[in-house]
């Protein structure tokens, strides 16, 4: 009779999808958390150079886009409308290539990182751990519930990354649009000033000599 409460407690503490129960091993998920925390975070400088090596077209496209904007502003100051419009078209082309390169690179390296998840050291005791990215006790395969939770975390991280990339691209497009509108507004102001100057000049009357007027 004294063992009945313990048996009921064992059944209550069993997790969904775990037929063997986890009350005998309350720290079954500690290796997974420890494995994630043992990885040192990448330094910002190393991450910057790694991104430069992985996606060289993105910084090159950004520099070309900035160069086209600078050229457009110079042509606007000089009053060359044709070259100004041409520089704006180059800016749009460079920006489109930069966005396309960023999206393709993010998708490619995201798939590559997901396919190359580091697996634990293989041995005869923990061979079942190679079935997925979920770490369990040695000799035990991951349960359906554990695998489902791991897939949910992976999908959530991927969706958050794609959302951040989309927000960054939207901010860049909005900034470029505002800059282009500002440049076009400045060009219209210059044209209005030129029209005002030409309108204020006195026009000579045909057949009338201004020198004879008193």
UniProtKB/Swiss-Prot annotation:
Coiled-coil residues: 177-197
Residues passing through the membrane, by range: 57-73, 88-109
One example of a Gene Ontology biological process annotation: mitochondrial respirasome assembly
Region ranges (Disordered): 1-36, 195-214
Any one cellular-component term (Gene Ontology): mitochondrial membrane
Main localization of the protein described in the UniProt heading: mitochondrion
Pfam families given in the database record: HIG_1_N (PF04588)
Subunit record text: Associates with the respiratory chain complex III/complex IV supercomplex.
Record's function text: Cytochrome c oxidase subunit which plays a role in assembly of respiratory supercomplexes.
Family from the record: Belongs to the RCF1 family.
Protein name per its UniProtKB record: Respiratory supercomplex factor 1, mitochondrial
Record organism: Mycosarcoma maydis (Corn smut fungus)
Lineage per the UniProt record: Eukaryota, Fungi, Dikarya, Basidiomycota, Ustilaginomycotina
Gene name for this UniProt entry: RCF1
């Amino acid at each position: 009779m004294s063992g009945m409460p313990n048996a009921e407690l064992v059944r209550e503490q069993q997790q969904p999808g775990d037929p063997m129960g986890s009350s005998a091993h309350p720290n079954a998920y500690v290796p997974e958390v420890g494995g994630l925390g043992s990885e040192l975070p990448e330094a910002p400088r190393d991450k910057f150079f790694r991104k430069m090596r992985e996606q060289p077209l993105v910084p090159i496209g950004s520099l070309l886009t900035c160069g086209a904007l600078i050229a457009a502003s110079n042509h606007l100051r000089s009053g060359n409308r044709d070259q100004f419009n041409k520089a704006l078209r180059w800016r749009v082309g460079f920006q489109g290539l930069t966005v396309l390169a960023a999206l393709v690179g993010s998708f490619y390296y995201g798939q590559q990182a997901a396919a190359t998840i580091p697996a634990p050291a293989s041995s005869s005791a923990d061979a079942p751990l190679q079935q997925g990215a979920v770490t369990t006790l040695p000799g035990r395969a991951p349960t359906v519930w554990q695998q489902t939770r791991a897939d949910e975390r992976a999908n959530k991280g991927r969706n958050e990354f794609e959302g951040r990339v989309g927000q960054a691209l939207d901010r860049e497009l909005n900034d470029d649009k505002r800059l282009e509108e500002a440049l076009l507004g400045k060009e219209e102001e210059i044209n209005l000033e030129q029209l005002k100057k030409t309108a204020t000049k006195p026009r000579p009357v045909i057949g009338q000599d201004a020198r004879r007027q008193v």
